[in-house]
Amino acid sequence: MDEPLSSLDAKLRAELRLELKRIQKELGSTLLYVTHDQVEAMTMADRIGIVAEGRLMQVGTPREIYGNPANLHVAARLGQPHINLLPADLLPGGRPPSGTKTVGARTEHLDIVVGKDANAEVDWIEHLGDQNHLHIRAGNHKLVTLADPYLAIAPGDRISLTLRDPLYFDAAGQRLS
C-alpha cells in the first residue's frame, strides 16, 4: 500500500490506521505499507525500514529504531517533537564517548529546572492540552521539547537544561554507543 491514508483528515486517518491494523492481524497477512508519516509508521508497523536515497538505512521494530537509531538520518525520522541535534558541548550531563560531534536529545533526554543555573531561555510555549511544546534557545541553538502543562513556566523564563542519556553521533553522522 502506497500512502493510502495521506489525503484523509486527521480523525479519519487515525480511525483507519486502527482498522487496517486490525484487519491485517485478523487475516494474518503481511502488509507492505509505504508512508512518509512517522505516526502511521510507528502505530501500524511491526517492523519499519527507513530508506534514504534508495538505500535501506535500518530495519527494526518502531521501538528499536526510535531508541537506537543507526545514524542521524534515522534519528530524525521518528519522534514528536523531532529530535534536537546539538553540538556535543552545548549542554551539561551525559557522558559523550570519544569522537562525539553531535548529541541527539529527545524529550526524554532533557531535564528542565526553572531558574536554577540557567543555560537556556524559553522562547515560546505551544499549549496542547495534555502537554506543552516548549521552544527553547540555548546559545545560538533552538530546541523543542515536551513539558507538563502544569509546569509553571512562561516565555522569557531562564531555565537549566541538562542531558540525561542522550544519543551520540560522530562526524559522519553514525551512532556511537
Tell me what each language-model feature is.
Residues P81, G93-S177:
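Non-catalytic connector elements of ABC transporters
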Residues G67-G93, G104, T162:
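C-terminal boundary and immediately downstream tail of ABC-type ATPase nucleotide-binding domains
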Residues S29-L32, I83, Q131:
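Secondary-structure boundary/capping residues
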Residues M1-H73:
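ABC ATPase nucleotide-binding domains
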Residues I48, V59, L78, P87, ...:
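Short glycine-rich loop/turn motifs that provide flexible caps or phosphate-binding loops at active sites
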